[in-house]
Amino acid sequence: MQITTIGLDLAKNVFQVHGVDATGQVVVRKSLRRAQMLPFFVKLPPCLVGIEACGTSHHWARELIKLGHEVRLMPPAYVKPYVKRGKTDAADAEAVCEAVTRPTMRFVPVKSPEQQAALSIHRTRDLLVKQRTQTINMIRGLLAEFGIDIPKGLERALLMARQIVDGKSPDVPIEAAKIVGTLSQQALDIHVRLREIDRDLAVWLRSNDVARRLMTIPGIGPVGATALAASVTDPHQFRSGRQFAAWLGLTPLQKSSGGKERLGRITKMGDKYLRKLLVVGMTALVRRARQNPEGDPRLADLLARKPTRVATVAMANKTARVIWAIMARGETYRTGHQPALAA
């Protein structure tokens, strides 16, 4: 009996394999150590390998593709319904093997090392931004206990902290001033690292054609363009711009039944980092439209009819569709083109 389909449950050191033949009969069910993984698959004829899209999955997918196997990654949430009972590595591998053969299953494209490297820059940048915010908020909270209110803005906060460290505020004890100095130096160090990361993203942007074309869209900056280009391996996996917007969680949640359509809030499913970047970018466009309604009359009209946040999400939905069109068709943004707003 020849193995045609394998379900592979990944882990750090011990991997579980569940293989079946063309009739669905179990041929192999075994665990492998990390060092045994590639030698095991080298001996097999080319077959279909299903893997949950989790940590290290893209690495192993690339390695197995080099050996001639067809590898398909699946979202873990879509594999879970095929687990019959209990939670074991063997049960998970069997569920993966069953799920990968379903004709309606949705798969995750395998990312290249370059894409994963770019995404690691974004993950690090997002972490450092959060840490910088936490540090500044810590300084604000500490000084508030001594009756000192720090103005908004990073530069103002660091300037005020420096004045306190230099002893220009006698109301702050020496011990507290030392802590403020430590925190302000940490915030400054993080800020310097963020500037370095932004320069790395600018270099990656110049070398990537897709990211450069996405930069032509209003509201999409270097961070958003590089994140989208690195996250979307194949735009043709989506049938339309609406499906791409749904993948980002920017479409209404449907609870329709009996022929009656019921739409709720946006689903907020998918990559929340990409969704956040889109919404933040559209927030800037909405703010500009409020200051200059003649610049975008249709957005100004939408703001007159809908709450600000609703209009912002509608713009993010519209922009997601434009992004898909540009990525799928290899075009750049046409300034005169005005697709319908999703209100």
Could you describe each region identified by the protein language model?
Residues M1-A343:
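A detector of single, family-specific signature residues
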